Amino acid sequence: MKFTGSMLLIVLTQVCSAQYYYKDLVTTRQNERRWSLYKENRVKSVKLSSFERDGKPAEGFTGDQEVSGESLTTHTKASGNAESWIVATYTPQGLTQKITDTSDTYRSASDYQYDADGRLQSILNTSIETDNHLRDVEQHIWTYDAAGKPSSMLKIKNGNDTTFVRFVLDEKGNVAEERAMRNKTDLPVIYYYYDTDSRLTDIVRYSLKAKRLLPDNIFEYGDDGRTSSMLVVPDGSNDYLKWLYDYNEKGLKSRESCISRQKELLGKIEYQYTYK
């Protein structure tokens, strides 16, 4: 099995379906913290190198990131996958402003809007499959309670398909449950679990097939507070992949290693930084 291909896409996305709280709020904050680290350490560019389980470079893979002004461009190309350019633009305050994802046959643009307190208010995504001219528009509209915690979200697709999402908080104010309804039908509940420091540890949903709660993701943290590993269960799979993270002295990610359920190394991605 080659490391590039579907597994490479998982390391770039790492988000299962639904998980609106994780995808819209948590992941966005993580990307903004990475951007802040890039700016703080005056990162100019990053080279991504992919290696197979035997340590040999992954054939046909190239990857790099370029920092220019208030934007970060990530370019990747892998055997069997379309060449991709992801451009993330940030406000002077470090908030995500726009993300575009472009390949030979696909283009997606997400515009972010915030309220006066800097809380995410709306994400408007427009995606186009250029080869067959299909166009989708999806908007996520967020609302918050008096304490500034997420209370609900509307997902509106193509102006006429609405999913209502509400959030249940735990005693510490963390989002504990994500309950969605579409066409008057309840969708599977997403559960979020945390450690004593309110760090996200598990994202779980009920499996109709297994008739029990099963994880989508499991997170672990090092003594420095950084994420040390993330377990990913691909949609519709009984298997999982686990990503192990290493960081350099500046707190920047230096390596991502992928291991299988059988604890076999499948491959790794290394990051080399150039500074201004």
Model-predicted regions and their roles:
Residues M1-K23:
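Bacterial Sec-dependent N-terminal signal peptides
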Residues Q19-K276:
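Buried hydrophobic residues that stabilize the cores of well-folded domains
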